[in-house]
Structure formats: structure tokens, C-alpha cells
């Protein structure tokens, strides 16, 4: 009997070792397992934070969901938010959702989009795109281009939207994608390096908005974190998006780091970020570079002595800091629409 118990214990130990070994191997030879786990963080249901304001706003907004746009990539759908009673072509806000490049969905900004359309009378386009690692850089910025081309070429849409007044924006990874696309439209050499033609004229691009965007990604090579989970998260996202385990030395990392690719033609920009578990130092570097170029910038950051403000804080409308950021964003859009 004692011998049988020992055999069972030994078998269990060997099984656990085998499973742990397989997990470690899976996590080190491919980004897919870790990317799946990270994507689950962004897969929860959409929760309305300020139901009172949202319920009022949605009475005055028309939402068309899951419109298909031509693209070689999948997840090529978009949602359109327009003010009711729109009598003339209106300013167009094109928004790219966040999710660490590996997750997220266009529906995540439903509350924000509905309120902004009601308050500013712009049209708001929320775009889906194929996430990493199924599609690696620069797939997402090129898929955004597919969506913009669709919006410009569709005759019915051209009658409703004023492409002479286009605002690009995004949150988290989507902010980086959106502002990279803005850099492509305003920097011919940069566009050439990505093999992309410019679709929007400089004068058509009125402004950009970055909510917690990683705008200077090369900084993460030098950042030290005591958190194993944070290191794992960063490595997963970078490996998945840039397509190489040696992402720290990749040319793609330099290309997606936008501070060195903007010029004086870049449009006026609103930037905000939190001071923990986010990319505030990258946002600050980007804002400082724009100011050096005499580009109009409005920013909202939080110093270390202020309260802790986490990544994507701006959508938690139950908090005063999110409410204030929304007001600043609304005023910014009204000024440049």
C-alpha cells in the first residue's frame, strides 16, 4: 500500500512538472498564449459609467453598427454615431480603440462617442481592426487607412461628413495607431518609410486626441519594473505587435515611436495620461516635442504627488478627474471642428 501511494505521488509530481514545462515552453516560443491571456483583460461587457448623462445623450444620437469596410484584414467593421437632425456635412472624428494591440473592441467607446456627438454635433466613427499577433505591425495603421479610404469613397458618406474637418483620436494602443496615422498624413518621408500614400491633406486634418497612448514606445526598453506581471505584459504586447521576440532592437520599435517622426505640420493635439500603470512619460515626451515644433498642444498629466491615476482613467465618468478630462476634450473638439 505504501509503495502504491509513493508511485501515485511520484506520478502526480512528474505530471505537474510536465505541465509547468509545457506552459513555460509555450510562453517562450510564441506570443500567442500570453496574447490570448492579455486579450481577455479587454473582453468584458461594456459598462455605462454615467447612466444619467448617457441616457440623455443617446436620445439625440443615431448609431449604425458593424458597417463593413473593404480590407485584406479581418475585423473590418466600424460603428457610426451621428447627431439627429443633421442638416449639413459635419466634422468627422475617427477613433481607434485600445486593448494593448491584442484585444479591445470598437464598442468600448460607446458611452464616450454618444456623449461627444450629442455635445459637439460631430460625427464619430469607431473602428475595429485585426489585433496582434494575428496581424503584426504595421497592419493596424494600414487597416485604419483602409477605413479612411472607405469613408472618403462612399458617396453617401461624403454627403454627410466634412472631410475638410477631420479629427483623429484613440485610447491606449489605439491612440498610438491614430497619431501614427496622423504623422503619416503630415510627414511625406515618414509615409514613404511605411510604404503608404497620404490620404488626408494636411489642411483636412484638424486635430488629434490621445487618451493614455504609448506615443514613444522606445522608452520601454529602458524602463525598470519590479513587477513580474508588468514585465510579462510589456513583453507580450511588444512581441505580439512588432512580430519578433527581439523587439527591443527592432527597427519597427523605432518606427512606432512617434516623437522622432512628427514635424511642424502635425495638427493641434490634446494629450492626457495617468501616473500609474500607463504611459505618462511617453505622452509628456510627445507633448514636449510638439511644443518644440510650435504645434498647439493641450495636455493633462498628473505628478507623483497627486492622487494615483491609472491607465484609461478618462472613461470612468464616476470620477471627477474623468469628468474634467471629458469637458476639456469636448471643448477641444468644439474649438477645432
PLM feature segments, named:
Residues 1:
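Tryptophan-rich substrate-binding surfaces of secreted polymer-degrading and adhesive proteins
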Residues 4, 8-337:
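Alpha/beta-hydrolase superfamily serine-hydrolase fold, recognizing
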